[in-house]
Amino acid sequence: MASALEQFVNSVRQLSSQGQMTQLCELINKSGELLAKNLSHLDTVLGALDVQEHSLGVLAVLFVKFSMPSIPDFETLFSQVQLFISTCNGEHIRYATDTFAGLCHQLTNALVERKQPLRGICVLRQAIDKMQMNANQLTSIHADLCQLSLLAKCFKPALAYLDVDMMDICKENGAYDAKPFLCYYYYGGMIYTGLKNFERALYFYEQAITTPAMAVSHIMLEAYKKYILVSLILHGKVQQLPKYTSQIVGRFIKPLSNAYHELAQVYSTNNPAELRNLVSKHNETFTRDNNMGLVKQCLSSLYKKNIQRLTKTFLTLSLQDMASRVQLSGAQEAEKYVLYMIEDGEIFASINQKDGMVCFHDNPEKYNNPAMLHNIDQEMLRCIDLDDRLKAMDQEITVNPQFVQKSMGSQDDDSGSKPSSYS
């Protein structure tokens, strides 16, 4: 091993044993070029360092190995990274979160390139757990995990990191930018859409769309298109975006989504035939955007919406008559829709198989059973917790030096603009 590398190993050992992590971070940041020049000796360096005791040194070496233009032995490197992430010292790597996250990004890109996304899901879950200060902290690795879960069509492992409400962002030594934030909410929305949890999907798309922005983001544009479709499926209309949404959305993103706005407009007429014609008209656009599956679900939801409207007019109705009124192909298709809607709790009805009549019923829920009371109790606890968090955030902002300085400056400007009362 070259003398410069020996010095690097000795410095890593010494600084690690002394607990001088800040100085160690400075060392590994300066040593990238040295390590890159000695690629053939890096496995020897890894052998001389202990993963648990010298986590930052091992991280620096693995990061450089993954940065190579071509990786000669990917399987060995993957095993080394897998072992490192599972056994490294979490307290140590939090001093170099930018490099640790960078290693995870490199791993993700390599697995995507090799079409092996499933292999990285468990590794990235461990990486997030090592890096997070708490379960409500968002890291840039979250977006990597969601990307691999989508590509592998393996959604459930990511749900543990999607079902929590994020309250904080890991700054990653200043390296965190908007892209992983947008990707987390966009990919998360796609995962929830795939699981047909449309309410949560809509929330995630909204977070991506309403991110403060000064320029058009392709991720925001794609999230906006899916937001329109999921809104129609869930609510039968496009939900109004919050007032704090960036002007970029109205000025640039909406004009780039004309086909989707046309779809929403035709959907509001409750005419399936017109909607089918519009889908045929913009078939190429919807297919290119990979949204044809959602568009078909919009058409299906319009049939359901029209069936729900019938429940407000009729007490009983034949399946054939229902099919005619909502423009379905026949009684058999109408029966299929009614059975699915009964199963999902979208309508309350029964079908008489003898005469093919559908009887509509009132909602049997009386809101007085123990399960319902438990749900209400849980919602109240969530509201109390949210109120406590808002108060804590408000207090944190109130004592923030930048906020105090800015608010005092505003007060000075206001007092300076007032006319003097003295003559």
Swiss-Prot record:
Q: Which family does it belong to?
A: Belongs to the CSN3 family.
Q: How does the record describe its quaternary structure?
A: Component of the CSN complex, probably composed of cops1, cops2, cops3, cops4, cops5, cops6, cops7, cops8 and cops9.
Which spans are transmembrane here? none
Q: What is this protein called?
A: COP9 signalosome complex subunit 3
Give the location in the cell: Cytoplasm; Nucleus
Main location group: cytoplasm
Q: Which SMART domains does UniProt cross-reference here?
A: PINT (SM00088)
Looking up PANTHER family in the UniProt record yields:
26S PROTEASOME NON-ATPASE REGULATORY SUBUNIT 3/COP9 SIGNALOSOME COMPLEX SUBUNIT 3 (PTHR10758), COP9 SIGNALOSOME COMPLEX SUBUNIT 3 (PTHR10758:SF1)
Q: State the UniProt keywords alphabetically.
A: Cytoplasm, Nucleus, Signalosome
Q: What does this protein do?
A: Component of the COP9 signalosome complex (CSN), a complex involved in various cellular and developmental processes. The CSN complex is an essential regulator of the ubiquitin (Ubl) conjugation pathway by mediating the deneddylation of the cullin subunits of E3 ligase complexes, leading to modify the Ubl ligase activity.
Q: Which organism is it from?
A: Xenopus tropicalis (Western clawed frog)
Gene label: cops3
Q: Give yes or no: UniProt keyword Cytoplasm.
A: yes
Q: Which stretches of sequence are listed as region Disordered?
A: 403-423
A Gene Ontology cellular component where this protein is annotated is: COP9 signalosome
The record ties this protein, via Pfam families, to: COP9_hel_rpt, CSN3-like_C, PCI
Which lineage do the record's taxonomy fields give for this organism?
Eukaryota, Metazoa, Chordata, Craniata, Vertebrata
Lineage top rank: taxon: Eukaryota
